[in-house]
Structures are given as C-alpha cells and as structure tokens.
Amino acid sequence: MKIIRGFAQAEKRLSRRDKAGFFLDETERTELARRLGVDPEKAVNGIIADVRKQGDEAVLGYTLKFDRANLSKLEVGQPEIQQAASEIPAELFEALQLAASQIRAYHRFQKEAVWKTAEIMQGKQLIRPLERVGLYVPGGKAFYPSTVLMTAIPAREAGVKEIILVTPPGANGKIPAPTLAAAQIAGVDRIFACGGAQAVAALAFGTKSIPKVDKICGPGNIFVTLAKKAVFGVVDIDGLQGPSEVLIVADQYANAEYCASDILAQAEHDALASSILITTSEDLANRVNDIVESKADTCSRRDIIKQSLRDNGLIAVVDNINEAIKLANMYAAEHLCLLVKDSEKYLTQINHAGCIFYGEKASVVMGDYVAGPSHALPTSGTARFSSPLNILDFVKYIDIVKVDKQDIAKLGQAAATIAKAEGLECHAEAVLKRLE
C-alpha cells in the first residue's frame, strides 16, 4: 500500500471533489462501452424502454442474454422457497436466524423511537408505512443472503404491506438456497428471478408478473445503479451506491493485526473497494503495511485484493488525532473504524460517516452481518447528506392542518394579504369567505 505523510498530502489524496460520477468509474465505463458498443447509460435507457413496452417478455429476454438463464416464468414458487431452509447447512441457517434477530431488534428499537415522535406530533402529523417496496439483491455467480436480511427486515419492521425481492438467477435458472432461506426468515412476500436494469425497470413500471412498487432499495452493479437513477421520480430509491470503502483512524495503541485484517476484508469485496488507514504512528503504518502485503498472497481472492489495494489503498501518517478526525469527516466514509485509545470520546467529533465502529473488537465484518444496523450504507462521500437504510426509508409522513374559528380569526387576514401580494386573488378570496 502507498504510504503518505502529512495532513496536506492526505487531504489532497482523500478529496472527492473530482468524483462526482462516483458510480461511473471511467475505466469500467470505457470497457463497458467498448463491449456493448454503446455508452452504459444509453444501454440502460434502452433496456428500460424495452421493459416498459414488452413487459415480462423483455425481462425474460434480457435474463437469457445476460444471465444465460432460459426461464418460462419469473416468480419463484412458494414450495421452492419453503424447501430452501432444508437445503442449506444447519449452521448457516442458525447463523442467518441469529443475524435476523439482531437486525430485527435494532430496527424494532428504532421503530419505537419513531412512533414516540409520532405520538408527540399527534394531531399535527400522520406516519404511514409504504404500501409496496422492491428489494434488489445481487446474485448470479454469487449470493448474498445477508443483503436480503439487511434490506427486508427494516422494511418489515416499518410495516410495509408487501415486500418484493428481485435477484439474478444462476445459469440453471435457480436462486441459491441461502438467498431463498434468508428471504423466508425476513418475511419477503414474493421473489422474482431477474436482475440488472431489467429488474429495476420492472419494479418501477410493473409488468404482468412483477407488480409496480413505491420504492426500490438495495445495491447492484453499474447497470443497476444507472437504472435506479433513471427511474427515480417514478419511484423512490434508497440511494446510488458506489464501491464499498473503509477508513480506519488508529493511534499507536491500535492492534496492527486488527487494522490489517479489516483492510484485507474490505479489499476482498472487489477491485474498486477503498481501504484507507489514517494513523498518528509511523511504526503502526509500517507494521500494518507489512502484514497486509504478506497476507494478501495467502487469500483466495488475492488478485482482487491486490488490485484494490494498488488502485484504492492508502496509509496516511498525520501529526495527531484531531487531524485524522478532520480527514475522516472530509472523506465521509461508508465504514469508519476508530481504533484509538478512549475511542468513545471521539464520537461527538464525527459528523460524516455511514456507520462508526469503535472498540478494537468492532470489525466492520460484524456490521456486515450480525451487529444489527443495516449494512446498506451511503458510499462515495454521500454520507455527508444521506443515511444508512433504516425504518425511516420505509415510512412517509402526512401533515395535518385543522383550522377552527379562533385560528381563522388569528391567521386568516395574514394568509389573504400574502396571497394578494403574490397575485392570487382566488387564494385570498377562499380565506376571506371564511372570515365573513
């Protein structure tokens, strides 16, 4: 990993000012354009148009083209879903159940807090869950049951009436059993074997098989992200997720092995993942770098890890923790680890992060699977203005206005005066009539 020294150098390297198109990595975009013969955004817009026009036929056609799965129907039957639990190792099923209980407890606690606020606002505001949401879970060659739990359980706890899940099938046309088992545990209502931009379009506009939803949540590749961007406004979305990232703030007391293991775990995601260590200790920087370089060769995904660390890995040595915290706030990482002495006292200084992990046992991996908060987090600096997926993503508020005689007497003339000033005479008249 590259090691740099000094706040100014670190600030320059960690600046995101030139990363406005974070989910459109130029290398990836150029390669995709070469392979497709068209810009990815144009390709996605074409897929969306086809799905709007041809419905299920287009979704099935693109599933055959991109996933090599020749399906006659898109929906996964309930017998197949119910059987999935018996097809996975008991240890995995129990682990998924434990993770689900943690996620459920966390979001139930949040729900209670949200509903208490609603009680305080009684008579002024209503809170209502969304009717139907669509969850996108990556699939195909890999499977991610954890993402099923992390997106579906917050929706279920919020009171969403119907949860639809889409995920790409394998070439055999099947959804992996762990994904189906997780969906059953989380309370997903319906599952469809499709992915990519075609699945997002189907959720946004509806087809004969796939119902139109109110909101689409979940991470995906560049095509999924561009499709979510394109349909926003027709439906709501949770955000535009880019490559995963971790930023570790560490002092001389930090465990170098722990720092290195979290860096390797992050780099293991994909070649675009970012792994950053900011430390006040030159000695720790060198030890972590040595461990990472020696262990990278022993990992099964060594090629991905090496490319990720080469392109997006960084160690910065700064003078003090205050400088490190300032850099962390500037970067607004998806995952922020505080591996420093008395780490809890620095929580109040953190303004921008998707999720904060503090205490030396708090590996990001715990947040990925079992800690409780959703692992669907803002990336690429969007933690400056957006939040992790949670209960509030699946509810909406309706304001209430009640006006009695005292209210109209007190406020009516002011409303009419403002309306007249804006040239809206009928507005003014609607109020003045009530003052008669």
Swiss-Prot record:
The active site is at 334 (proton acceptor), 335 (proton acceptor). GO terms for molecular function: histidinol dehydrogenase activity; NAD binding; zinc ion binding. Pathway: Amino-acid biosynthesis; L-histidine biosynthesis; L-histidine from 5-phospho-alpha-D-ribose 1-diphosphate: step 9/9. PROSITE patterns: HISOL_DEHYDROGENASE. The keyword Amino-acid biosynthesis applies. It holds the Pfam family Histidinol_dh. It catalyses: L-histidinol + 2 NAD(+) + H2O = L-histidine + 2 NADH + 3 H(+). NAD(+) binds at residues 136, 198, 221. GO terms for cellular component: cytosol. Its EC number is 1.1.1.23. It comes from the Bacteria. CDD domains: Histidinol_dh. Zn(2+) binds at residues 266, 269, 368, 427. Keywords: Amino-acid biosynthesis, Histidine biosynthesis, Metal-binding, NAD, Oxidoreductase, Zinc. Binds 1 zinc ion per subunit. Its cofactor is Zn(2+). Substrate binds at residues 244, 266, 269, 335, 368, 422, 427. Catalyzes the sequential NAD-dependent oxidations of L-histidinol to L-histidinaldehyde and then to L-histidine. Belongs to the histidinol dehydrogenase family. This is Histidinol dehydrogenase.
